[in-house]
Amino acid sequence: MKFLGLMWSNLKRKKLRTTLTLLSILVAFVLFALLSALKLALGGGVNMADANRLIVRHRVSFIQLLPHSYQQRIASVPGVTLVSLQLWFGGVYQDPKNQLGTFPVEPEAFLAMNPELTLPEEQKQAWLKTRTGAVAGSSLAKRFGWKIGDRIPMTTPIWPNKDGGAWQFDLVGIYDATKKAADTSSFLFRYDYFDEARS
């Protein structure tokens, strides 16, 4: 404690040196935080995915469709056991700020490829039977207060509906995850409904 006064007077003696020293320490911590966040963001997909999953997308953008013939070509590659479609929909719920991770998928294949996502059997069957059926992640359903049976309208700047209005979805299930890193904030609906209703 007797050296605190000496340290304080030394810090005040050369203010420029003190300021530059504190700034260099601050910059080091900021860089560490930013690089840690970048590492987490870039490695997040690897941590979430299993080693036995491969994602193939259009080289231009993830909102572009791959030709349907590619599905058979990919399925014929040795070692491939299952192929499923998934596309970025860019759904907006109520407010343009509420752009959600919304994906048209093939329900059975998607659930088979993502065993870490848990959906009760009766909800899965309802999803398979309901053309406009959709399932939401538990965190997304909690965020908006959605319950099974709700009718959810969504718009998208990417994929207009044939009738020009909002896309209408019936919430038939709420999925959860067995792995902590799995995403429970997505909104998934049937690819066949998307394919026939888009303009």
Where do the protein language model's features map onto the residues?
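Soluble periplasmic/extracytoplasmic beta-strand elements of cell-envelope proteins
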Residues: 53-57, 84, 99-104, 135, ...
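Amphipathic alpha-helical segments that mediate coupling or scaffolding at interfaces
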Residues: 10-11, 45, 174
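N-terminal Sec/SRP start-transfer signal
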Residues: 1-32
